[in-house]
């Protein structure tokens, strides 16, 4: 096998549900998975802070075309907040900027977290990956450069108080895309009057994907020593990313048209008026995503024909 072909990698498609280790950037974790699988192409569905652990769906090959659907999905986190200390980054990796005595109890915390449930405008931390004039905000923060603060509308669906011990509060948070848990914890600390920062963060759900299916880098590395068979067995199909979309089944003739970018008639769907559909063959082979227009399914994102085994 030529060196050029080795560099090109394998043309495989699927999703790895990685449990990102603490202290590693999401991009570093992504590159580790890509190398282990020797994949041609890889991407993830939304970064986690280096401090955080938990579900990081890594998309390989054609699955990268559908990563946006999980970027836009709801997320769930288990977070530990340390009360009494604020930091520059609102987590344990930042410098301490304020310390105050903690005089709260379970009832006070339970009442405070209710204030953050629902739709609200949130100002992300200046130590975030959001862009300003093409650079992430953390670039300006590290240079000591002030930039205009922008708010974004987010929704916190629920917050459950799991535990309080000394100055540590553990919460389970379900929220919309774009929610910064560090900012939420900092705001909670301000409301309690003592300050707070994130000391542990674990993402335990993305859309309807739960943490039970996660694998670690150590598990992947062990399997890689034996070849690709064990690794490939852990791949989930690309349509795992599309659980929120209804599915429509198409015939063999319609499959050919769809893969060539042609619209196909929208079958009767018992009143379902969804604008986007997950398209599959009669044998449950995933083909892509279609958008409805004039009672037809128009291909929006399609698995490349060479990756479809008809």
Swiss-Prot record:
UniProt keyword list: Isomerase, tRNA processing
- What CDD domains has UniProt attached to this entry? PseudoU_synth_EcTruB, PUA_TruB_bacterial
Catalytic center residues: 49 (nucleophile)
Q: What class of enzyme is it?
A: isomerase
InterPro entries for the chain:
PsdUridine_synth_cat_dom_sf, PsdUridine_synth_N, PUA-like_sf, PUA_sf, tRNA_psdUridine_synth_TruB, tRNA_sdUridine_synth_fam1_C, TruB_C
Question: Does the keyword Protease feature in the UniProt annotation?
Answer: no
GO molecular function terms attached to this record: RNA binding; tRNA pseudouridine(55) synthase activity
Report which superkingdom the organism of origin falls in: Bacteria
Look up the EC number in the record and give it: 5.4.99.25
Query: Which Gene Ontology terms describe the biological processes this protein takes part in?
Result: mRNA pseudouridine synthesis; tRNA pseudouridine synthesis
Which reaction(s) are listed as its catalytic activity?
A: uridine(55) in tRNA = pseudouridine(55) in tRNA
Q: Check the record and name the HAMAP family matching this protein.
A: TruB_bact
The protein's job, in short, is: Responsible for synthesis of pseudouridine from uracil-55 in the psi GC loop of transfer RNAs.
The UniProt entry's sequence similarity note says:
Belongs to the pseudouridine synthase TruB family. Type 1 subfamily.
Q: What is this protein called?
A: tRNA pseudouridine synthase B
Q: What is the lineage of its organism?
A: Bacteria, Pseudomonadati, Pseudomonadota, Gammaproteobacteria, Alteromonadales
């Amino acid at each position: 096998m030529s060196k050029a072909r080795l560099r090109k990698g394998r043309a495989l498609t699927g999703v790895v549900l990685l449990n990102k280790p603490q202290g590693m950037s999401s991009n570093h974790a992504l590159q580790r998975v890509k190398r282990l699988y020797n994949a041609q192409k890889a991407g993830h569905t939304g970064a986690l802070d280096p401090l955080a652990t938990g579900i990081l769906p890594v998309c390989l090959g054609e699955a990268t075309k559908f990563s946006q659907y999980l970027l836009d999905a709801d997320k769930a986190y288990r977070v530990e907040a340390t009360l009494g200390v604020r930091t520059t980054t609102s987590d344990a990796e930042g410098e301490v900027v304020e310390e105050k005595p903690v005089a709260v109890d379970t009832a006070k915390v339970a009442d405070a977290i209710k204030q953050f449930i629902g739709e609200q405008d949130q100002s992300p931390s200046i130590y975030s990956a959001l862009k300003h004039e093409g650079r992430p905000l953390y670039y300006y923060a590290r240079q000591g450069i002030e930039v205009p603060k922008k708010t974004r509308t987010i929704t916190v669906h629920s917050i459950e108080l799991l535990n309080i011990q000394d100055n540590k509060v553990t919460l389970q948070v379900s929220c919309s895309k774009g929610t910064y848990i560090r900012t939420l914890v900092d705001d909670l600390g301000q409301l309690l009057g003592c300050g707070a920062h994130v000391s542990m963060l674990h993402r335990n759900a993305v859309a309807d994907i739960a943490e039970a299916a996660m694998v670690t880098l150590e598990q992947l590395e062990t399997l890689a020593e034996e070849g690709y068979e064990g690794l490939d067995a852990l791949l989930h199909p690309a349509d795992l990313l599309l659980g929120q979309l209804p599915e429509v089944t198409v015939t063999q003739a319609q499959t050919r048209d769809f893969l060539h970018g042609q619209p196909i008639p929208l079958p009767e769907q018992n009143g379902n008026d969804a604008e986007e559909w997950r398209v599959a063959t009669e044998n449950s082979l995933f083909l892509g995503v279609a958008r409805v227009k004039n009672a037809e399914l128009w291909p929006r994102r399609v698995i490349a024909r060479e990756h479809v085994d008809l």
